[in-house]
Amino acid sequence: MRLLVAEAASPLSSAATPTCNSHTCRWKPYSNSTDFTANASVLLILVISALICALSLYAAIRCFLRPTLETEDDHKPDPEAAASSTPTTPTLVYSSDLELAGAEAECAICLSEFEQGESIQVLEKCQHGFHVKCIHKWLSTRSSCPTCRTSIFSQHSETPSSHINA
């Protein structure tokens, strides 16, 4: 009887301590710490690679879509060239008798009213008046009237009717 009990006990004891390998134990791949370290390393490498790719793409887009400083400087007018090419307009002394286009007695650039005896400049083409300092600063970056946006440069093209002799 002891033999029968020993045989019966032996399969139970071996079942209590099973040998677990990757084919017989389904939890084996998740229990090995070296596999977890390798998986974490691969995941970390993938995240870093994705970050590098994203930053490279951002830099490329910023480089190609953003104009360079050299092209921006080409579009800005040169103040010295603008001063030399700006037509000279006479400086007048403001008085209430002075008639300006639009009948406004204020500078459209600084929005302050003209005072008696103040120096102003009147543009020849549109007859709008401005403070001397205001219009010089305006014309150093632009070539149009601040009020009506008319070009300050005169057009030299004459109409054909001006050549007809009667």
Curated annotation (Swiss-Prot):
Pathway given in the UniProt record: Protein modification; protein ubiquitination
Q: What is its EC number?
A: 2.3.2.27
Q: Where in the cell is it found?
A: Membrane
Q: What membrane topology term does the record carry? A: Single-pass membrane protein
BP term (GO), one: protein ubiquitination
Spell out where the chain crosses the membrane.
41-61
The cross-references to Pfam families, in alphabetical order and at most eight, read: zf-RING_2
Matching CDD domains, A to Z?
Answer: RING-H2_EL5-like (cd16461)
Report keywords, A-Z: Membrane, Metal-binding, Signal, Transferase, Transmembrane, Transmembrane helix, Ubl conjugation pathway, Zinc, Zinc-finger
Its domain comment says:
The RING-type zinc finger domain mediates binding to an E2 ubiquitin-conjugating enzyme.
| Protein's UniProt name | RING-H2 finger protein ATL79
Name the source organism. Answer: Arabidopsis thaliana
